[in-house]
């Protein structure tokens, strides 16, 4: 079974850097495949839990983007392009290329009827 894991570093000022991985499990062993680096606003970090991800049309950005489902006390938490913590009011930032890659990756999984799970660490 595969799922995704976002491993974050200790906040550095206003920024929290992280890395998104695809996790393959085989027995008790996990194999991590790096997908892309991430950036969050330290003041608005997503709680360390497991979330479902869906790809939907963003009313704000007017394009398909991945969105985290059931984030406690919040809504509309998306993965979108950005390079500085101030580019986010609580979303997860990735490069423009990685935004396209993630959207396509998760859209394909969604069409395949697979549940997309993402663990925040």
Task: List each language-model region with its residue ranges.
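Cell wall/extracellular polymer interaction/catalysis modules
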Residues: 1-92, 99-104, 110-121
